Amino acid sequence: MDIVGGQNLRQMWDDLAEVYGDKTALIFESCEGIVRQFSYASLNEEINRTANLFHSLGIRKGDRVALHLDNCPEFIFCWFGLAKIGAIMVPINARLLGEESAWILQNSQVSLLVTSAQFYPMYREIRQGNSTPLNHICLIGEQLPADDGVSLFSQLQARQSATLCYTPALSTDDAAEILFTSGTTSRPKGVVITHYNLRFAGYYSAWQIALRDDDVYMTVMPAFHIDCQCTAAMPAFSAGSTFVLLEKYSARAFWGQVRKYQATVTECIPMMIRTLMVQPAAPTDRQHHLREVMFYLNLSAQEKDAFTERFGVRLLTSYGMTETIVGIIGDRPGDKRRWPSIGRVGFSYEAEIRDDQNRPLPAGEIGEICIKGIPGKTIFKEYYMQPEATARALEPEGWLHTGDSGYQDEDGYFYFVDRRCNMIKRGGENVSCVELENIISAHPKIQDIVVVGIKDAIRDEAIKAFIVLNEGETLSEAEFFSFCENNMAKFKVPSFMEIRTDLPRNCSGKIIKKNLK
């Protein structure tokens, strides 16, 4: 089923501007509370001016341009402005440091970067090191540094026409983006995402949450992340909805922002749900218009139930990854939830559980979750310049090996067990980190928890728990280990525990385990 046809992102925005005109497309709120708002017509003009800006700097179809930005309207301008001229966006995680950012610039062969004054000193050092092909920086800010090869985004954009001046032929198979994976266990890989991928994501994710043009979709997810782009922005724009982009997440401000913008849909990661739950209860907790809250792994059933009971919202599970573009397994708005199931496979996809010999497994047996899609259309096209890595993950028939363990029941509902790399091998037993984390998170003194495997000369691996306590709490080792012994099999009880003030996380809220080992 082809729901995109031949429509690329340039055509999408031209059509949206014509159909929705003065309807509000984008609302942005900064950390200081400054609000900027754009209609579909005015946003398309900003996108065109930005496309012309890139053309004036020598960018042509197929060229790669990096963005290192926090959430801001300019990210949206650049994303679609580059797509309109057939150039390729390379978004960089705003939390990355110099060496990691330079590595991405080098591996994607980027010569032009758009960034803000906050990150400029880091890139000045990178350019001085001559380790990358970066030769020009377009700066979002008020003051132009006295350095060669730097220009102000606002000045350049203001000089441009609102009519597109460069319109090369585009195909939906053309790359629109190279999105580097989070790299929690190794160097990130560049996931190539096409015009078709993004257009499909818009239609698919809008279907997943039954999105309409009178909806308001609010997100605090970082714009450089697949969730913001393909689960929030693309469906909101594709449906003619209003997209509300907040610069940063604040647990104290979140519900006020939901009410302020009358948001009907939002998305949360587990960290957000947990921090919202520790805010003081208020009479206004249920005074909002939210009908769906999309969330991503992992939450325990107790956490889900407590959240929905307190705030009166429906949680909608969505399971996916950068390579799948969207949440290919999940709940549907009209379905009864079957927790702890992560839902059923969505349209245009197939899913199987396979063993170590790549053979399908029957219901109830744990194996690897494998997804079948169409490369470059419903799943990613390839890893940039890494054919061997592409071949390992993606079979010729379109089967993608997720690296996740799970099983399905007789009714086709899928259950996530753990990342295969998160399975701890302890004395011949496979122990799921997620299972232990869900059990330990039920302790009333514990706010956050992560479990890792560490080398053990006798039993392959020992289990260590890193813990963040609720404010004002103390927890002894004896109390912790007693709780574990009473709630899990003996071979699953951690050997070590360490209390920390926080845990290292990437932009999507995933804990960076390599920083803990």
From Swiss-Prot:
It is an enzyme of class 6 (ligase). Pathway: Amine and polyamine metabolism; carnitine metabolism. One of its GO terms (molecular function) is crotonobetaine-CoA ligase activity. One of its GO terms (biological process) is carnitine metabolic process. Coiled coil: none annotated. PROSITE patterns: AMP_BINDING. Belongs to the ATP-dependent AMP-binding enzyme family. NCBIfam families: PRK08008.1. This is Crotonobetaine/carnitine--CoA ligase. It comes from Salmonella paratyphi A (strain AKU_12601). The lineage of its organism: Bacteria, Pseudomonadati, Pseudomonadota, Gammaproteobacteria, Enterobacterales.
